[in-house]
Amino acid sequence: MRIIVIGAGLAGLTAAWELRKRGHEVSVLEARARVGGRTWSLRLGNGAITERGGEYVFPTEFAIRRLSAELGVPILSHNVRYARRTVDGRHVSFAELEATTEQITETLRGMLADGLTRVSVEDAHREALGPDYQQHPVYRRMVTSLANDPNLVSAASAFLYDPDADQPFIDDGGRFVGGNQSLAIELARRLGAAVRLEHPARAIDQSSSGVEVTLADGSTLHADAAVIAVPLPILRSLRLGFALTPGQDAALSHRIMGTAAKLGVPLAAVDDDIALQSTDLSWWSWRSLSADGEHRIPALSCFAGSRATLDALHTEAGPGRWVSELQALRPELVIDGDVLLTDWSDDPWTRGSYSAASLDWTPADLDAFDVPAGRVAFAGEHTGLEQTLNGAVVSGLRAVTAIEAVERLTETSGGPA
């Protein structure tokens, strides 16, 4: 089949790569002048690579690790306490982290058993950890990573449906040696001329015989099927001339887009804390292991999550306030060159960072995108519960399975109704 993939982030490129390997003719349309979407790597003035977007590849995230091995894109450990950051002078032990997480989970189960509904991440932490819960390192880590208001995010989605729940917890994460964008760049290199940059799609329609994609310049492209792999706000802005399945409509209505910012800071000197969390705002900074396995890279990476935190850091006005807060938290920091701020709320092709499950989320949403809507499948972190680089890859693979259903239906009946 001829298949159009809209979006050249990790989700779309994974789908395109797998579809080509299975003998399909693919075309990938990307609005930007680069591939990678929310993976975006640049070098700071001192030569250190910084990630403007997605950062961590965790040990049990097998889909993206399998893909990186296939493509020969190596992974290096960050060697950072991702889940056990220093907060107010201490970080929790491995055992305390596991015990606290179990305490919150069991408290949540009890709340739900008592008939409570629409229980938020905030509610679960408050009930489990008591009046000082907002100062607890486990709370501070989770709400930072949510990139959303924890009062609006489903606790059940966060604690009861973890896709890695059956895997051992390992407090480490990896990064691609050449920058996290390097995986997307290698996929695009192998796909070659099939990837078309600066080709934003505006509308998509379908019939029993195929799909039609309308570009921003008014031109149209035709194919047998399509995969839409764009961020949630962009998906909502596309003109779709067809209906989604009821399950897909419901699942999308249960997603809320978060926002986040990153700060890359070249340095000449800093303290030795590799993972330091703000005590009152949802941001943290870390320093990754270098490729020599001994030293740290000459840069700090910082992540801030949620609209309230970005407003408090005045990111709309530039990096100045955030840099001041960072230097107050790390008084030994000596900055060596220009810092690099990336505010994803300002990005026209994402309009935010990544999504979360709202209080209306239900477990039925989990399977909504296993099937296509006619001849169209969907990919992207918003189609599942993994808001990670691996989640993007998993969603691309899921979309391939959905497209194969289109192919089977086409072969047996001449096309979807």
For each feature predicted by the language model, list its residue ranges:
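Conserved flavin/dinucleotide-binding core of flavoenzymes
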Residues: T14, R22, G210, D280-A417
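N-terminal Rossmann-like FAD-binding beta1-loop-alpha1 element of flavoenzymes
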Residues: R2-V28
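Dinucleotide-binding Rossmann-like beta1-alpha1 core, especially the glycine-rich loop
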Residues: A48-D114
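Active-site/ligand-binding neighborhood in enzyme catalytic cores
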Residues: L112-A203, S208, A229-R239, A357
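Glycine-rich FAD pyrophosphate-binding loop
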Residues: R20-G45
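Glycine-rich active-site loop/strand segments that organize a redox cofactor
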Residues: G37-I64, S157-A165
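Central helical "cap/lid" subdomain
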Residues: Q206, L215-D273
